[in-house]
Each structure stands twice: as C-alpha cells, then as structure tokens.
C-alpha cells in the first residue's frame, strides 16, 4: 500500500467516524451540580456504543463528604428507525459500569435502617460495579445536529466499602469480626436523565 492510498483510507475512516459520533451532556444532572458527559459511536444502522462518566465533588453534605465517580460502557440497539429520516428513536442496551464513592447515607435512610452511619460526620468509602439495562428515546430537534435523549437505567449494584467516623477512624459492623471490606448488593435504578446530544 503506497503512502497516498494509506492517507486516503485514513482520512476516509476518520471522516466516517466523526460523522457518526455524538457528544452528550446530561441536563438533569447538571441542575444538581453533577456533571455527566458521554460519547456515542454508531457501529451500524441499528447498533451503537456509548461511554459516559459522571462525578460529584462535594466536601460537606450534612457534615460528611459526598464524592462519587461513575463510568459506564453501553452497547445500544435501536430496533426501529423512522422511515423518512432514518432517524434513531427508541433504544435498549446492556451496560457495565464501575464506580468509586465516599459519602454518607441520607438521614431519612439512617433513621429507618440499622446502620453504623447514624453518627454525625460518619461516612462510607468504597468501590462498586454495575450490571444492567438502559432504556431510552431520542427526540429530534429542529437543528439536525442536536437531539434530546431521555433515558433511565438500572440493574444490580455490587459494592465493597468501609465505614469511617468523622475523625477518619474505621468503624466495624462487628468489632469482634474485623473484615477487610463490607459487602452489599442491591437491585435498583442508578442512572437516568435528559441528555443534550450533538453530532460531530
């Protein structure tokens, strides 16, 4: 392959890549000062891959830190396309995610659940993994480069974490059994919002 042919194929590939790529920002999470941004690459007419991340950076919520980061890999399927515009609409997609957190459970939970986090300033810090499904719908706007995307996702969240008091000392569920990590698993809705998307 000569240099001219290689350069032509290189430019053609990246032209197609960028023509089928969307960047996104979650308008709903932005309202609560939690940035959530993503990028979606069209793999074929009905399939796409999305990578998105979100984070919070609050040092003091009810006397405790509230810091989280999440990243999700998602494979999307668009079962139906609008015939006139070949416009993607409803989608469903399995996802796998990873997160880190340092936070306190809300007071309304600690008042009804038996937990070591009742003391002011106490918090938990750890890692979690997500396995689930996302459902959503793209809503076209007048400007063809922009769309709105309504979505919600949930599944299972598996966590490994430690409890700490406000001085930063470890709290154990059972002082006689000092585990390296506490573990928990829940089935819940853990992502969603309204994305503003832009086609590059």
Each language-model region and where it sits:
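Outer-membrane beta-barrel "beta-signal"
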Residues: 72-77, 186-200
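Bacterial Sec-dependent N-terminal signal peptides
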Residues: 1-22, 196-200
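Short loop/turn motifs that connect adjacent beta-strands in outer-membrane beta-barrel proteins
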Residues: 46, 80-89, 140-148
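Transmembrane beta-barrel strands of outer-membrane/channel proteins
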Residues: 25-29, 41, 51-55, 92-100, ...
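Extracellular/periplasm-exposed beta-strand and loop segments of Gram-negative cell-envelope proteins
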Residues: 26, 53-71, 101-129, 158-170, ...
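Membrane-embedded beta-strands of outer-membrane beta-barrel proteins
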Residues: 37, 73, 92, 133-135, ...
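Short glycine/proline- and aromatic-enriched beta-strand/turn motifs that initiate or cap beta-hairpins
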Residues: 19-73, 197-199
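Mid-chain, structured segments of secreted extracytoplasmic proteins
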Residues: 64-108
